[in-house]
């Protein structure tokens, strides 16, 4: 994609269309993942540099109906996972601890097209996750990110997420863990 399919706009959220991912989206999702991997590498962030997430993981997300696609003017510009099935690696947290032990949504694998970065799309994904929580009667969202992913950590703070400590992934890597009580 040569450019993001919109110029500077004030109401980006009103222009985005969210839908569940399908098998036909896997190629584009992998392009978005490659964009994110490249961006992380340029920022010297050791996140997604080991081939994660794989095509198999993305396919599993789609089969599990937890992958979401973000379209703008019919073009896929972002993807994310929003799940209500918990996260095993969140069972042990070092630091402050989770705000509560309520049922929660978890957001994973946010990837935005390079040309659409810094347009507020990741923020809209998190708003969408909050809306899904409200629809399902779930009052909490948890998310984790790499300690060097300053952009995501800053966004989470601005959006009212509380830093709760560190979790350990199955790979042994640490991630900074955040929690928000949805109103």
Where do the language-model regions lie?
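Conserved GNAT-fold acetyl-CoA-binding loop/helix
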Residues: 37-57
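Conserved GNAT acetyl-CoA-binding A-motif
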Residues: 126, 133-145
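Conserved beta-hairpin
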Residues: 66-80
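Conserved acetyl-CoA-binding loop-helix of GNAT-fold acetyltransferases
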Residues: 112, 118-131, 154, 158
């Amino acid at each position: 994609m040569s450019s993001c399919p919109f110029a500077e706009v004030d109401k980006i959220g009103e222009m985005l269309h969210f839908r569940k991912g399908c098998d036909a989206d896997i190629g584009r999702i992998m392009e978005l993942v490659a964009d994110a991997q490249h961006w992380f590498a340029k920022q010297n962030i050791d996140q997604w540099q080991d081939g994660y997430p794989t095509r198999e993981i993305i396919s599993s997300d789609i089969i599990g109906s937890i992958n979401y696609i973000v379209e703008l003017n019919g073009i896929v510009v972002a993807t994310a996972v929003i799940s209500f099935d918990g996260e095993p690696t969140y069972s042990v947290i070092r630091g402050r601890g989770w705000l509560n032990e309520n049922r929660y949504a978890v957001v994973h694998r946010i990837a935005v097209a390079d040309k659409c970065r810094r347009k507020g799309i990741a923020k809209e994904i998190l708003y969408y996750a909050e809306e899904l929580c409200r629809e399902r009667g779930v009052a909490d969202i948890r998310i984790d990110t790499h300690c060097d992913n300053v952009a995501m950590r800053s966004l989470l703070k601005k959006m009212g997420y509380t830093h709760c400590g560190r979790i350990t992934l199955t790979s042994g890597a640490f991630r900074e863990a955040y929690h928000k009580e949805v109103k």
